[in-house]
A protein has these predicted regions:
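Residue-level signal for tight coil/turn positions that link beta-strands
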Residues: 73, 80-82, 116
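A short, polar/proline- and glycine-enriched secondary-structure boundary/capping micro-motif
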Residues: 95-98, 131-137
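Short beta-strand edge/turn micro-motifs at domain boundaries
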Residues: 103-135
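A short hydrophobic beta-strand element
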Residues: 81-91
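A solvent-exposed, acidic/Ser-Thr-rich amphipathic alpha-helical stretch
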Residues: 4-5, 23-78, 88, 103
Length: 138
């Protein structure tokens, strides 16, 4: 398997970890020992324990009963033992509070590093799709 194929597979596993809000799956793809960072619209998490508790637990697990993250248009650039992945995504969910459906679209950048021969996520930054209206996006 090439590095690019391994990274594409890792992104698929990342989506599965989100869809199931499963930190056991997530721990197989994140660098759980490093200085990892996850920037998302509801906050910034520093370190694996914060990502596990606040993003997987409080955001994905507590807020939604169903989740489906659909990554698309992956662009992978490998730089030795580091890689950058950029992709668009669509997220379908059911809100736990009232059962209402939620559909959002966005974009994501992931920085990965290869440790022990395996790719791991070191940094994620995701946001909604760009806005182009007057006085938007600043």
């Amino acid at each position: 398997m090439t590095d690019k194929q391994a990274i594409e597979s890792l992104v698929a596993t990342y989506a599965e970890s989100i869809n199931k809000a499963d930190t056991d799956i997530a721990s197989t793809i994140w660098d759980t020992t490093g200085d990892v960072v996850f920037i998302h619209p509801r906050g910034t998490e520093y370190g694996w324990e914060a990502i596990k508790a606040n993003f997987y637990g409080k955001t994905m697990g507590d807020m939604f009963t169903k989740r489906e993250l659909k990554p698309r248009d992956l662009s992978v650039a490998v730089f030795g033992d580091m890689a950058v992945v950029v992709f668009m995504w669509e997220f379908h969910a059911t809100c736990r509070a009232d059962g209402a459906p939620l559909v959002t679209e966005g974009r994501e950048t992931q920085v990965m590093r290869k440790t022990g021969g395996k790719w791991r996520i070191a940094h994620v930054h995701y946001s909604n799709m760009p806005v182009t209206g007057d006085k938007q996006g600043f």
